[in-house]
Amino acid sequence: MKRQALAAIIASMFALAACGGEPAAQTPAASAEAASSAAQTAAETPAGELPVIDAVTTHAPEVPPAIDRDYPAKVRVKMETVEKTMKMDDGVEYRYWTFDGDVPGRMIRVREGDTVEVEFSNNPSSTVPHNVDFHAATGQGGGAAATFTAPGRTSTFSFKALQPGLYIYHCAVAPVGMHIANGMYGLILVEPKEGLPKVDKEFYIVQGDFYTKGKKGAQGLQPFDMDKAIAEQPEYVVFNGHVGAIAGDNALKAKAGETVRMYVGNGGPNLVSSFHVIGEIFDKVYVEGGKLINENVQSTIVPAGGSAIVEFKVDIPGSYTLVDHSIFRAFNKGALGQLKVEGAENPEIMTQKLSDTAYAGNGAAPAASAPAASAPAASAPAKSDY
């Protein structure tokens, strides 16, 4: 069963069919409309008060549009915690605890200096209280006490986004690890006042480790296993909450020549991610989601409860595999994604296979040919795991 599950994962990575799920790009018209609306809001705001703006938030892998204003605002963010059963893998379901109905929660994008007002609701069907700790907030608990909310209740609090960067938010109700392990995390981007450089495509990706009673691939609804979580022995390590969430039909898409920016988080609760895109080198990495930029990076560490921003230009077409390069997590536990790039081949950068000839090894006489061994009932394609 485990081999069959792995086969399904890897097969999806190399499917050549066209993929959906591409985040919608903001058009110039939409950007101009948003800018005009924001300008009108600012003009109508009484002196000494911040204009009030409703946040545009997005489910992964989509990213909210860039901030298109040069002044601070009060940004209103609505969040709802929902406990729901969803697919973890083929034939496998899990009772997730979520922000806004999915894992990760919606991505939030604000500007340095904004006041973020959070309206936090806990769905009446929830079985326990929930809250949110914003790593972007300065103050005890990151808002956890202010947002502690029973089922069927709504709490409101605000914080000022003092420092730019990419930050995790997560539930912090005891037992904290259990709430996070069930999927309660997401990212908030605090753009610097001057904004970020423009790129062609942006994607939102968060890794998480999940602890089920049954082993990976065990069918049916799988409950949370606290003993495995304490021992840090996950059955699943995945991007965006589910096996195959950004692979196969859900693959990310770009075109050759485009610059891609990925906002990468790690909800944990336990494992550190070694994030890597097979066949690419990160031109820039905003280390741990902060101001420091590293260049020409092959893999970057994303700590549990942390983040990184990676940028790279895709020069040639192909299927680029996203992995946690603690590699058994990728090919055996689900930490696989896919970026499909269309465009013209460029043999100056890389060719296809040019030849395939016999080799006897160190000048020795060629060995007599032997009958071909039968292929094992394995899961990976014969030619490559990539």
From Swiss-Prot:
<feature type="repeat" description="3">
    <location>
        <begin position="377"/>
        <end position="381"/>
    </location>
</feature>
<dbReference type="InterPro" id="IPR011707">
    <property type="entry name" value="Cu-oxidase-like_N"/>
</dbReference>
<keyword id="KW-0479">Metal-binding</keyword>
<feature type="binding site" description="type 2 copper site">
    <location>
        <position position="170"/>
    </location>
    <ligand>
        <name>Cu cation 2</name>
    </ligand>
</feature>
<feature type="binding site" description="type 1 copper site">
    <location>
        <position position="130"/>
    </location>
    <ligand>
        <name>Cu cation 1</name>
    </ligand>
</feature>
<feature type="binding site">
    <location>
        <position position="276"/>
    </location>
    <ligand>
        <name>substrate</name>
    </ligand>
</feature>
<feature type="repeat" description="2">
    <location>
        <begin position="372"/>
        <end position="376"/>
    </location>
</feature>
<keyword id="KW-0677">Repeat</keyword>
<feature type="domain" description="Plastocyanin-like 1">
    <location>
        <begin position="97"/>
        <end position="191"/>
    </location>
</feature>
<feature type="region of interest" description="Disordered">
    <location>
        <begin position="363"/>
        <end position="386"/>
    </location>
</feature>
<comment type="function">
    <text>Catalyzes the reduction of nitrite to nitric oxide (NO). It could be essential for growth and survival in oxygen-depleted environments.</text>
</comment>
<dbReference type="GO" id="GO:0050421">
    <property type="term" value="F:nitrite reductase (NO-forming) activity"/>
</dbReference>
<feature type="lipid moiety-binding region" description="S-diacylglycerol cysteine">
    <location>
        <position position="19"/>
    </location>
</feature>
<feature type="region of interest" description="3 X 5 AA tandem repeats of A-A-S-A-P">
    <location>
        <begin position="367"/>
        <end position="381"/>
    </location>
</feature>
<feature type="binding site" description="type 2 copper site">
    <location>
        <position position="325"/>
    </location>
    <ligand>
        <name>Cu cation 2</name>
    </ligand>
</feature>
<dbReference type="InterPro" id="IPR008972">
    <property type="entry name" value="Cupredoxin"/>
</dbReference>
<feature type="binding site" description="type 1 copper site">
    <location>
        <position position="184"/>
    </location>
    <ligand>
        <name>Cu cation 1</name>
    </ligand>
</feature>
<feature type="binding site" description="type 1 copper site">
    <location>
        <position position="171"/>
    </location>
    <ligand>
        <name>Cu cation 1</name>
    </ligand>
</feature>
<keyword id="KW-0998">Cell outer membrane</keyword>
<feature type="binding site" description="type 2 copper site">
    <location>
        <position position="135"/>
    </location>
    <ligand>
        <name>Cu cation 2</name>
    </ligand>
</feature>
<dbReference type="InterPro" id="IPR045087">
    <property type="entry name" value="Cu-oxidase_fam"/>
</dbReference>
<comment type="similarity">
    <text>Belongs to the multicopper oxidase family.</text>
</comment>
<keyword id="KW-0732">Signal</keyword>
<feature type="binding site" description="type 1 copper site">
    <location>
        <position position="179"/>
    </location>
    <ligand>
        <name>Cu cation 1</name>
    </ligand>
</feature>
<comment type="subunit">
    <text>Homotrimer.</text>
</comment>
<feature type="signal peptide">
    <location>
        <begin position="1"/>
        <end position="18"/>
    </location>
</feature>
<dbReference type="GO" id="GO:0005507">
    <property type="term" value="F:copper ion binding"/>
</dbReference>
<dbReference type="Pfam" id="PF07732">
    <property type="entry name" value="Cu-oxidase_3"/>
</dbReference>
<protein>
    <recommendedName>
        <fullName>Copper-containing nitrite reductase</fullName>
        <ecNumber>1.7.2.1</ecNumber>
    </recommendedName>
</protein>
<feature type="binding site">
    <location>
        <position position="135"/>
    </location>
    <ligand>
        <name>substrate</name>
    </ligand>
</feature>
<feature type="compositionally biased region" description="Low complexity">
    <location>
        <begin position="364"/>
        <end position="386"/>
    </location>
</feature>
<keyword id="KW-0564">Palmitate</keyword>
<keyword id="KW-0472">Membrane</keyword>
<feature type="domain" description="Plastocyanin-like 2">
    <location>
        <begin position="241"/>
        <end position="342"/>
    </location>
</feature>
<feature type="lipid moiety-binding region" description="N-palmitoyl cysteine">
    <location>
        <position position="19"/>
    </location>
</feature>
<dbReference type="InterPro" id="IPR001287">
    <property type="entry name" value="NO2-reductase_Cu"/>
</dbReference>
<keyword id="KW-0560">Oxidoreductase</keyword>
<feature type="repeat" description="1">
    <location>
        <begin position="367"/>
        <end position="371"/>
    </location>
</feature>
<keyword id="KW-0186">Copper</keyword>
<keyword id="KW-0449">Lipoprotein</keyword>
<dbReference type="GO" id="GO:0009279">
    <property type="term" value="C:cell outer membrane"/>
</dbReference>
